[in-house]
């Protein structure tokens, strides 16, 4: 028997409308009734994952930001692993426009989400 199930959100736990449906709620409930632990691991921020946790009526640690953060159900950090500044600097030094691709640079700092300003301008003003 399984001791735990760890599920992603998008394309896994959430339906095509990016929401939790009754089937999923009932399935998670049955899993828990069997004594199997259930966790969420996602690339989303804590707040994006917490919304799903609340819909499932769970109080569990959430693995967020592609594994860079683990927070308890109240949002207190259990684990955090940030990129070192030297790697961030290398990422921001790349001339993405010369590559000719629509590359979006974004990241989290705590619970704040940041997107590079040029990308915002592109999507608002320049994209056909």
Task: List where the protein language model places each region.
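Active-site phosphate-binding/coordination module
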Residues: 22-127
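Asp-based phosphoryl-transfer active-site loop
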Residues: 2-18
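Short loop/turn microsegments at loop-to-beta-strand junctions
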Residues: 1-3, 58-59
């Amino acid at each position: 028997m399984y001791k735990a199930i760890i599920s992603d959100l998008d394309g896994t736990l959430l339906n095509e409308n990016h929401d939790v449906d009754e089937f999923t709620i009932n399935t998670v409930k049955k899993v828990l009734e069997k004594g199997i632990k259930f966790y969420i691991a996602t690339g989303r921020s804590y707040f994006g994952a917490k919304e799903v946790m609340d819909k499932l009526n769970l109080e569990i640690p959430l693995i967020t930001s592609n594994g860079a953060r683990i927070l308890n159900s109240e949002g207190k950090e259990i684990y955090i692993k940030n990129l070192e500044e030297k790697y961030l600097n290398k990422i921001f030094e790349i001339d993405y426009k010369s590559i000719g691709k629509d590359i979006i640079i974004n990241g989290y700092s705590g619970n704040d989400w940041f997107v590079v300003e040029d990308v915002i301008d592109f999507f608002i003003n320049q994209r056909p």
